[in-house]
C-alpha cells in the first residue's frame, strides 16, 4: 500500500493572528477579576497578559495589580472566566481583514492549513466554529491538546503530524514571541504579523518575514520561505 504524500502546511496562531479577540478577552478577564475586587484591565494591558492561556492571563492580571492570588482561588476564577467567555462567544471577535481571502488562496494552491494555539480547546474550537473557520483546517491543536505548548517545538511538530504535513515544507504564522520561538525551536520558517498582541515590536522578535496585512501572505511567499528553509537544512 502506497503511503499518502505529506502536504505543504501553513500553521496559524489564533488570538491576534487569525482572529481579533481582544475585546472579548478583556471583557471576560475583567468580569473574572472583578470577583476579587481588582480594577479592570485595558486593551493596552492585554499585550502583557495573553499568550499562555486563561490561567496564566488571570495570574498576570493579579500581578499587574500587585495583588496576591491564593492558589485555592485559581480554579474558581478560571471557571468564572471560561463560563463568561463561552456564554458571550463569539462576542465582538472577528477574523482579521483579508484572512478569508488568504486561506482560500493558500488552499487553492494546494497548501494544507492548521491552527496551533495556546488557547484551551473548549474555547478555541467553538470560537472557530462560530466564525465559520473550522472548514479550512486539517488540524486544530490547542494549549491542552498535548502535554506541552508553544514555545515548545513539539506543539508545532505535533500539529504538523496531525495535519499530515511535511515538516520540511511548513511555516508558522503568529503575532507573539511564543509563535516565533516555537517555529525557531522546530526549525520551521516563521511569519510575524504586526497587528496582534505582542508587547515587543515584531521585527525585534526576528521572524523570517514580517507582514502588516494578510494580502502579503501569498502562495509565492509560502514557496519562497519553504525553499529557503530547505536550502538551510
From Swiss-Prot:
Keyword hit for Magnesium: yes
Pathway: Organic acid metabolism; glycolate biosynthesis; glycolate from 2-phosphoglycolate: step 1/1
Database matches in InterPro entries: HAD-like_hydrolase_sf (IPR050155), HAD-like_sf (IPR036412), HAD-SF_hydro_IA (IPR006439), HAD_2 (IPR041492), HAD_sf (IPR023214), PGP-like_dom2 (IPR023198), PGPase_prok (IPR037512)
Positions annotated to bind Mg(2+): 13, 15, 175
Keywords for this protein: Carbohydrate metabolism, Hydrolase, Magnesium, Metal-binding
GO biological process: carbohydrate metabolic process; DNA repair; glycolate biosynthetic process
Record field: transmembrane: none
Any single Gene Ontology cellular-component annotation: cytosol
Catalytic reactions of this protein: 2-phosphoglycolate + H2O = glycolate + phosphate
One annotated GO molecular function: metal ion binding
Annotated Pfam families: HAD_2
Cofactor(s) needed for function: Mg(2+)
Keyword match Cell wall biogenesis/degradation: no
Active site as annotated: 13
Enzyme class: hydrolase
EC numbers on record: 3.1.3.18
Function: Specifically catalyzes the dephosphorylation of 2-phosphoglycolate. Is involved in the dissimilation of the intracellular 2-phosphoglycolate formed during the DNA repair of 3'-phosphoglycolate ends, a major class of DNA lesions induced by oxidative stress.
Similarity field: Belongs to the HAD-like hydrolase superfamily. CbbY/CbbZ/Gph/YieH family.
HAMAP family noted in UniProt: GPH_hydrolase_bact
Name of protein: Phosphoglycolate phosphatase
Organism (species): Agrobacterium fabrum (strain C58 / ATCC 33970)
Gene name of the record: gph
Amino acid at each position: 500500500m502506497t503511503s499518502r504524500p505529506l502536504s505543504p502546511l501553513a500553521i496559524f496562531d489564533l488570538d491576534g493572528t487569525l482572529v481579533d479577540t481582544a475585546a472579548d478577552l478583556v471583557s471576560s478577564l475583567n468580569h473574572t477579576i472583578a470577583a476579587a475586587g481588582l480594577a479592570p484591565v485595558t486593551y493596552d494591558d492585554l499585550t502583557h497578559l495573553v499568550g499562555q492561556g486563561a490561567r496564566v492571563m488571570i495570574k498576570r492580571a493579579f500581578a499587574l495589580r500587585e495583588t496576591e492570588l491564593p492558589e485555592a482561588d485559581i480554579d474558581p476564577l478560571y471557571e468564572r472566566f471560561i463560563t463568561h467567555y463561552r456564554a458571550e462567544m463569539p462576542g465582538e471577535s472577528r477574523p482579521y481583514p483579508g484572512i478569508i481571502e488568504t486561506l482560500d488562496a493558500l488552499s487553492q494552491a494546494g497548501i494544507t492549513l492548521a491552527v496551533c494555539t495556546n488557547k484551551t480547546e473548549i474555547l478555541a474550537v467553538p470560537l472557530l466554529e462560530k466564525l465559520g473557520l473550522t472548514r479550512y483546517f486539517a488540524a486544530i491543536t490547542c494549549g491542552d491538546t498535548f502535554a506541552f505548548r508553544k514555545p515548545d517545538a513539539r506543539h508545532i511538530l505535533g500539529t504538523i503530524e496531525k495535519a499530515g504535513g511535511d515538516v520540511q515544507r511548513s511555516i508558522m504564522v503568529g503575532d507573539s514571541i511564543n509563535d516565533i520561538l516555537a517555529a525557531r525551536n522546530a526549525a520551521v520558517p516563521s511569519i510575524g504579523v504586526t497587528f496582534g498582541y505582542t508587547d515587543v515590536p515584531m521585527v525585534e522578535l526576528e521572524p523570517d518575514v514580517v507582514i502588516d496585512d494578510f494580502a502579503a501572505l501569498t502562495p509565492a511567499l509560502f514557496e519562497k520561505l519553504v525553499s529557503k528553509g530547505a536550502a538551510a537544512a
